[in-house]
């Protein structure tokens, strides 16, 4: 799977990751250009040992984006859903990279840029 994308809606990305986990064959992921936001989770979800990045690829991780509006109760519901999405992203990153949940939480707390060198890249 070749990736060059700024991400997208987390629910759409989760559907891709679910399908990657469903198929019985290995899934090779190759990053080039820009792989950002939730798309970096797709990169990390490739089969271990079959995740690659081109030399000048920009890989960026961040919190799932979203906003809240409406009544106080609606804002609380939306904020809880955003928190759930963040925990899902942390879990995916932790399970695919072997990093602790705390390390992944810190990595996702703000925009984090990863280099393409395999030993330095969390997603490799």
Task: Describe each PLM feature range.
Residues 2-16, 20-66, 108, 113:
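Glycine-rich beta-to-alpha active-site loop
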């Amino acid at each position: 799977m070749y990736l060059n994308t700024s991400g997208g809606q987390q629910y759409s990305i989760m559907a891709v990751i679910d399908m990657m986990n469903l198929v019985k064959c290995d899934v090779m992921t190759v990053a080039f250009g820009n792989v950002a936001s939730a798309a970096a989770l797709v990169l990390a979800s490739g089969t271990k040992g079959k995740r690659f990045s081109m030399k000048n690829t920009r890989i960026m991780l961040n919190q799932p984006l979203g906003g809240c509006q409406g009544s106080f109760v609606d804002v609380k519901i939306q904020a809880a859903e955003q928190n759930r999405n963040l925990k899902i992203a942390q879990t995916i990153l932790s399970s695919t990279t072997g990093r602790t949940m705390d390390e992944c939480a810190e990595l996702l707390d703000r925009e984090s840029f990863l280099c393409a060198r395999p030993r330095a890249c969390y997603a490799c």
